[in-house]
Structures are given as structure tokens and as C-alpha cells.
């Protein structure tokens, strides 16, 4: 993963403008009273690069980071059972708090991929979890 991808999402390494990192500490979500500095960078121009970054991480070994989606790996080994896979991802990425409707939608979609294709099932499920709006808001 090159610096270009992190620059594209507005967070170049070692380039934070303040001690608050990249997030404006006083950012309030529009039309609410909710203080949410982490959403100060979220806009229509940053959403696609963030999705691209998630896809890149899922499919490439980068900077010593490798996510193992093979059948022998921690995600792929659960891929034959779409429900078990999504529950496992929900535990890891959402602290076991994945909404039921989100879980159902992901299980249904992942179930369309043949159970014999553990790598595709696992990487698809992980991508759907980490790019969901619920993941961004809750975790």
C-alpha cells in the first residue's frame, strides 16, 4: 500500500496537521448535536477512495500486512457456513453487535458464492462488513 492511497483518503502518513490527528475535534454531524470528529473527513470525495483502500487491503499483501482468506486461514476456514463466517467477522469487527438485518443481508449475499470457494466467500464477507455504514458508525 503506497502513500498515494492514504493521501487519497486525506490521511498521509506523518502528515497530521494537529495533535488531534486528521480529525477536527469540534466537528458536529450536520443537522444533529452529535460531536463526531471521525466524520469530519467523510464526504462524497473520500468515500470511493476508502472503499478502494479496503478492497486493496483485502486482495494484496502490503507493508507486512497480509489478510489470509484461504481455506486454511482464520476466515476461509469458516467460509463453508456463511452464517458462521459472518458471525465471526461480526465478533471481530463489530464486537458482536452486528444488526440482524445487516447479518441477514450479508449471509444471503455470501451464500450466492459457491461454498467450495472459501477465499472469495471470506473476502467478500469481510469487505461487506468493513465497508458498511453500520461498521463506520458503530466501530
Model-identified regions with their sequence ranges:
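Flexible, low-complexity segments enriched for small/polar residues
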Residues: 1-139
Amino acid at each position: 500500500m503506497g502513500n498515494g492511497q492514504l493521501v487519497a483518503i486525506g490521511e498521509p502518513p506523518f502528515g497530521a496537521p494537529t495533535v488531534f490527528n486528521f480529525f477536527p475535534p469540534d466537528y458536529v454531524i450536520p443537522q444533529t448535536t452529535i460531536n463526531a470528529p471521525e466524520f469530519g473527513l467523510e464526504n462524497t470525495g473520500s468515500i470511493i477512495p476508502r472503499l478502494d483502500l479496503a478492497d486493496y487491503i483485502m486482495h494484496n499483501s502490503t507493508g507486512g500486512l497480509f489478510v489470509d482468506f484461504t481455506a486454511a486461514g482464520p476466515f476461509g476456514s469458516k467460509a463453508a457456513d456463511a452464517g458462521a463466517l459472518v458471525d465471526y467477522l461480526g465478533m471481530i469487527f463489530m464486537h458482536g453487535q452486528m444488526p440482524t438485518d445487516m447479518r441477514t443481508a450479508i449471509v444471503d449475499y455470501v451464500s450466492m458464492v459457491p461454498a467450495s470457494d472459501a477465499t472469495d466467500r471470506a473476502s467478500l464477507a469481510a469487505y461487506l462488513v468493513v465497508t458498511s455504514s453500520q461498521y463506520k458508525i458503530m466501530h
